Amino acid sequence: MAEDTQRFSDGTAYEQFMGRWTRAIGTIFLDWLAPPTDARWLDIGCGTGVFTDLIVSTCSPATVVAIDPSEPQIEIARKKAIAQRVDFRVEDSQKLPFSDNTFDIVVSALVINFISDRSQALAEMCRVCRPHGVIAGYVWDFAADRGPVCGSART
């Protein structure tokens, strides 16, 4: 029975089951967000880099740092072509290793509801986002129609 269990910390399982949703909804989310070009991005909970790839391919960022707590997922992300343009790191969203006001845009795609201390993670996102920057994300709306819910804040 244990062999049948797949975890999303396993990058291959994530890519197979969730990657297609991340691509589909991520495109809608980035259209909704309408980010400026040449921004400094932080992608929280990047997994295998599916959403990060959308950022790089559609938003013309100046820089992108993408973090995830799962080493296996980051290993897969680092093997992708976008890795040349992205700094992929294994990090904890609740203890970000970046200076205050480092990023123009901080995003989280289908992740915030899985973080154990969401308040701390959001506080960290606010800390590393520059004044007048954007913090945004989307999650599944489990209470209503199970579709995506988007939200953003400007610092």
Give each language-model segment a name:
Residues 134-155:
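Conserved class I S-adenosyl-L-methionine
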Residues 33-35, 59, 81, 129:
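A generic alpha-to-beta junction signature in SAM-dependent methyltransferases
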Residues 94-105:
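A short acidic, Gly/Pro-enriched loop at the edge of an enzyme's catalytic core
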Residues 1-11:
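N-terminal, positively charged/glycine-rich alpha-helical extensions of SAM-dependent methyltransferases
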Residues 104-118, 141:
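A short SAM/SAH-binding and catalytic strip from SAM-dependent methyltransferases
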Residues 119-134:
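A short glycine-rich, Lys/Arg-flanked "PGG" loop and its adjoining helix->strand segment in the class I
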Residues 20-39, 54:
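Conserved alpha-helix/loop element of class I SAM-dependent methyltransferases that forms part
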Residues 40-96, 120:
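Class I SAM-dependent methyltransferase SAM/SAH-binding core
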